[in-house]
Amino acid sequence: MYIEGKWIMVNRLFMIIGTGSGQREDFTREARDAIARAGLVLSTERLSANLAGAAKVRTCPFGKLAENALSSTAARVAILVSGDTGFFSAAKSLRQKLTEHGEVQTICGLTSMQLLCAKLGTPFDDVVWLSLHGRKGSLLGAVSYNRRVFALTGGEQNAQQLCRTLVEAGLGHLRVSRGENLGASNEQILTGTAAELAEKPCGDLAVLLVENEQPGECCLPVRDSDMERGSVPMTKQEARWAAVNLLDLRRVPSEAFYASV
């Protein structure tokens, strides 16, 4: 098959499968069928726990999934990833590594946002989402200008620490729902203020839904009346607007910009 200027062998099929929370009941029928048809199933240790007894399951660190898939002799290889293959997923990097070596199929799964919102009985069509799990970004920036923000958390930006950040910014009153180990037997969902959840320890597999009933308007200009010292503005509004435009900033929901002009 000729794809993007390259000839590739298509006698091998790599199936990247989203497994939702990782619990068997969260697997779609398509995912279960694909696993049953595969000659080899590759998974991290955490996801393989729910596939106990399956002889064709091989566990390895995440960084070795693609390498193990390519070195195997199986014609059909299933690779399990958590969540959905299109939502801040490892599927993207896996596809890039496997495309030149065979056909790559992605099978979607449930996102943690869907799981949490379903448990809370709330829609997610108006939610701004971002991932802070091993990534840089600002929950504060997103929460300041949006009514509802969903965030994947982890590492240095864990759920408890993010709630502390909101408290430090004067947003400790905001309503926050925290989902931990969603779908597992030790699942825990808590709802309270950011200040309340900032005092409650949390593991690494957690997500947040933050609600701000009075978000700011990011596009409102700062006028002279907002910058007066005595009766004289510190700078002219036209100068401030021109200076900010020259910075050529792009609005990113997870980022906050600060300027002194």
Model-derived features with residue positions:
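Class I S-adenosyl-L-methionine
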Residues: 2-115, 258
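A contiguous loop/helix-start segment that scaffolds small-molecule binding in enzyme catalytic cores
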Residues: 5, 10-18, 60, 76-77, ...
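Solvent-exposed alpha-helices and their adjacent loops that cap or buttress functional pockets
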Residues: 9-11, 33-34, 72, 98-99, ...
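Short gly/ser/thr-rich secondary-structure transition/capping motifs
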Residues: 19-26, 131-134, 237
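Short gly/pro/ser/thr-enriched loop/turn and capping motifs at secondary-structure boundaries
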Residues: 48-50, 111-115, 136-137, 158, ...
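Short, glycine-/small-residue-rich phosphate/pyrophosphate-handling segment
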Residues: 112-147, 154
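Conserved alpha-helix/loop element of class I SAM-dependent methyltransferases that forms part
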Residues: 237-252
